[in-house]
Each structure stands twice: as C-alpha cells, then as structure tokens.
From Swiss-Prot:
Protein residues bound to substrate: 122, 152-153, 183, 189, 259-262, 332
Keyword annotations: Glycolysis, Isomerase, Manganese, Metal-binding
Positions bound to Mn(2+) 1: 399, 403, 458
Protein name: 2,3-bisphosphoglycerate-independent phosphoglycerate mutase
Listed pathway(s): Carbohydrate degradation; glycolysis; pyruvate from D-glyceraldehyde 3-phosphate: step 3/5
HAMAP family assigned to the protein according to its UniProt record, in alphabetical order: GpmI (MF_01038)
Record PANTHER family: 2,3-BISPHOSPHOGLYCERATE-INDEPENDENT PHOSPHOGLYCERATE MUTASE
GO CC annotation terms, alphabetical: cytosol
Active site: 61
Claim: Repressor is one of the keywords in the record: no
Organism per entry: Flavobacterium johnsoniae (strain ATCC 17061 / DSM 2064 / JCM 8514 / BCRC 14874 / CCUG 350202 / NBRC 14942 / NCIMB 11054 / UW101)
Length: 505
C-alpha cells in the first residue's frame, strides 16, 4: 500500500456504557454516526497498563499522544514514581538528597508545590506523602506544602477531603500546609499571566484570605459556589496573623507535579524570568522539579529525567522522505507536536505545523466550538493540494468542554466536532486520503456521576477507531500504541524494531 493518511484525534471522545450520561449520545452527530455505518470500526484501550500507566489509571492527552506517536507502550513517570514511593527509594534519589542536605546545612525552608489530588494526571498524593516522608528521614523541620486544589481530574468538591487527609498525614510532624489555591490560577498553561500572578503573590508575598484552618477555608469556598479548580488564594497564618511561610530567596522549592505542561508558568515566574507587567520577579531559589518541565530552564534540578523516545512515527516518516502536518489549537498544540514526537520540540524535516489560538474565554463552556472550524478551514486547502503524506489533527472540544462538567455545552462541542470532521473527511476522500478517526482517552461520554453530580474527569472507557478508506473493510481492536504501525502499513513504510506494537489492519 502507498496511501496518504490523516490521523484525526477526537480528544476526550470515549464509548459510553450509559448513553444517558453521554454528551456524544445526546448530541446530533449525523456525520460521525454515518461513519460507523459505512466504514469498519473497532475500539482502543487508552487506560492503565495499555498505555504504560498503573492498572486502573485513566489515560490523558499527554500519555495518549506519546503512545500514539511512539508505536509502543511508553512507561510513564506516574508508574515509575509510584514504584519509587512503594519501594521507599524516593529518599535515595541524589537530587533530593542534595536539596535536603542544602536545606539542613543552610537552615532553609523546603516548600512542596503541586496539585493535591490522586487524579494521577498531573500529580498524585502518594508522591507528596513520599516526599514528606523523605524530608522527615532527613530531620527537616521547616517543611511547607502549598496545595493546589484540583476539581478537574477528580470531582469538583473533593478538595476538602484531600486537604483533610493531608493534614491527618502530617499531624505528628513539623510539616505544615502554608497556602491553598485552585489549579485555575496555579496551573494555567495558556499564558494567562494575570491568573498565575494570584498564585505567585500567594506563595511569595502571602497575599490571600487569611485562615488558620485549611479544611474550613475549602468548605467556605464551596458555600460560595466556588469549587476546587477555582478556589481563590488562601494563606495559612499563625496566631499573630502572620503567614506561616512564604517563599524567599535561598529557599528550596520542590514542584511535585510529574506532568510537565501545567507546572511551567509558575516555575518561570518563580525562577526563570521577571514579568514586569505583573510585578512578578524571579527569585534565587534551590529549585527542583519531579520531572523535566523544560530543557531550557536555568538552575532547575530534575529528579526524574525522561529518556527521549526515538524512532517515533514523525522520525520514521522524515527518514522515508514524507511530508507531514501537525495541526491543533493552543490547548492541544504541545500534544500533536512535542508529545506525539516522543518529547522532541523541533519539527522533523518535511514537517509543517498549523496552530490556531484557543478562544480567550474563562471556561470553554462559554464557547464550546472552540477553534474547531478554524482548524478544518486551515486543513482543507492543504488536502486539496494533495502534497502532504501524513496529517496529525486534534479536535480539543470533547475533552476541554467535557472538563467543565456542563452537559449542554459538551453536546454543542460534539456537534461542532461532527461538522468539522465532515469538512475534513469529505476533502480527504475527494483527494484520496485514508482517515483514521480515534480518541486519545474518554471524557465527554460520561458527563454525570452515578449520584447525579457533574463528572469533569477523564474515563477508563474504550474509545472508537474508524477506518475511513474506499477499499479496506476491516480494522481490529487494539491500544493507542498500535496506531503508528497501522499508519506505516497504510503508507507502505517499514515499521522499525523500536515500535513493538502492531498494525490493526
């Protein structure tokens, strides 16, 4: 075979066992429904060991795109760090030993920053507990947690329990919670520096609502209808109404999120650049991140450095002299580039990139179509030219609007994706492209929890694979790692030995 191929990723578009709770099943999506009738389809697993995560762990976009491009199961940081915590080897990591030794010898505070939930997408509470244990093995007595509440990868009002459990865990130690703020502010990834500033001012300047009781502060936020993701800065104070701890020059900061994308902006403000407009100034800190957030950072130490994955789909196509396009809106642009390329920022020879900005709205339920139409309109002329051999396209809507937990908006998101998928696939068929329609993980097919509350998290449901091709009549079930070998078979390019998964044709 010598086909030209489009990989169309419908982000967050899973297969629901219960149509009542599914935005997809409640939406008017005639085109995607017609694909199931007219072309072969099967399902893919995107969770747990199928993608190199711990058993039962829901997949996510970073992991999904990494597996898709790699053509193999990529063992993730979450699984690696879980093992280190379980086997109590975290305290033996040299980077942590050096940080704790520096703190002890120089009488400096240690600040743990990160998302306090067991969502397992950006962080895990077990990792924080492991770090706390390690700090106590070193006899450190000035240890503070700056807790970012989640409400997005876990239920919107689960934060109070996570904070309660953390307090319970540290009650017989000198470790204290120093501040609380929602991830909306502390973990932005869309250059909304005005949000990041609130988190920066909280941890550096102690600016926030003063409190002596972390759990009560979270519960008070719920009473005002502000859920975990959006909790406004809370600074924990002592009996003299002074902040327990802020980050000052020379302190140790350990950012314990293992996923890289949402730790970058706060890290940049604290340690890399001055942002004069926001009055955020970098501090001279002993700064440690659990994984490598960015190769270019100066003076940031990394506990677990990733091995870059070689012989990804992009690299194999480069060697075969093929032209490729990576196309997405801002929210998923790193996924179709950096993650799909196995942790590589630089484009391959023959790779071009099309980016459209995600809409500047507070939350995507306000504009559920996002920038899907702009993506379709940008890609169709390229398909009509017929010069590109492979396209990796991501429609973000099902995931990003699914995360809001608002069913009506998610339905509109699905309908926008349906219309845009039609534009692209009509052009694909007219220009002799084969399209593989898949998702990287589930989300918008489960918008409601069994108790009736909104579900904002990813799921472990299987996702579809549809093979839109004029000749081929079969496709098998598989995992995300099987997609790159499938694409190579369609394109008539030899699969490298490093790709250990197999074609689903």
């Amino acid at each position: 075979m010598n086909k030209k191929v489009i990989l169309m990723i419908l982000d967050g578009w899973g297969k629901s066992p219960d149509p009542k709770v599914s935005a997809i099943d409640n939406a008017n999506v005639p085109f995607i429904n017609s694909l199931y009738k007219n072309y072969p389809s099967a399902q893919l697993r995107t969770d747990g060991l199928n993608v190199g995560l711990p058993e039962g762990q829901m997949g996510n976009s970073e992991v999904g795109h990494m597996n898709l491009g790699a053509g193999r199961i990529v063992y993730q940081d979450l699984a690696k760090i879980n093992l280190a915590v379980a086997h109590k080897t975290l305290a033996k990591e040299q980077v942590l030993i050096d940080a704790f030794t520096y703190a002890k010898e120089n009488n400096k505070k240690v600040h743990f920053l990160g998302l306090v939930s067991d969502g397992g997408v950006h962080s895990h509470t077990s990792h924080l507990r492991g770090l706390i244990d390690a700090s106590q093995e070193y006899g450190l007595d000035q240890v503070y947690v700056h807790a970012f509440t989640d409400g997005r990868d876990v239920d919107p009002k689960s934060g109070a329990k996570y904070i309660h459990d953390l307090q319970d865990y540290i009650k017989d130690t000198p470790v204290k919670i120093a501040s609380i703020v929602g991830r909306y502010y502390a973990m932005d990834r869309d250059k909304r520096w005005e949000r990041v500033k609130l988190a920066y001012d909280l941890v550096v300047n102690g600016v926030g609502t003063p409190s002596t009781n972390p759990v009560s502060s979270v519960l008070e936020s719920y009473e005002k209808d502000v859920t975990d993701e959006f909790i406004e800065p809370v600074v924990i104070v002592d009996e003299n109404a002074k902040p327990l701890a802020t980050i000052v020059e020379g302190d140790v900061v350990i950012f314990f999120n293992f996923r890289t994308d949402r730790g970058r902006e706060l890290t940049e403000a604290l340690s890399q650049h001055d942002f004069h407009e926001q009055n955020m100034h970098k501090l001279n800190l002993y700064y440690v991140t659990l994984t490598n957030y960015d190769e270019t950072y100066q003076n940031v130490k990394v506990v677990y450095n990733k091995d870059n994955i070689t012989e990804t789909l992009g690299e194999v196509l480069e060697k075969a002299g093929k032209k490729q396009i990576r196309i997405a809106e801002t929210e998923k642009y790193p996924h179709v580039t950096f993650f799909f390329s196995g942790g590589r920022e630089i484009p391959f020879e023959g790779e071009s990139r099309i980016l459209r900005n995600s809409p500047k709205v507070a939350t995507y339920d306000l504009q559920p179509e996002m920038s899907a139409y702009e993506l379709a309109d940008a890609l169709v002329p390229e398909l009509n030219k017929g010069e590109v051999d492979f396209v990796c396209l991501n429609f973000a809507n099902g995931d990003m609007v699914g995360h809001t937990g608002i069913m009506e908006a998610a339905i509109k998101a699905c309908e926008a994706v349906d219309a845009c998928a039609k534009k692209v696939i009509d052009a694909a068929l007219a220009n002799d492209y084969t399209t593989i329609v898949i998702a990287d993980h589930g989300n918008c097919e489960t918008m409601i929890n069994p108790d009736g509350s909104p579900n904002t998290a990813h799921t472990t449901n299987p996702v579809p694979i549809i093979l839109v091709d004029k000749q081929l009549k079969n496709i098998q079930d598989g995992v995300l790692g099987d997609i790159a070998p499938t694409i190579l078979e369609l394109m008539g390019v030899q699969q490298p030995n490093a790709m250990t998964c197999h074609s689903l044709l």
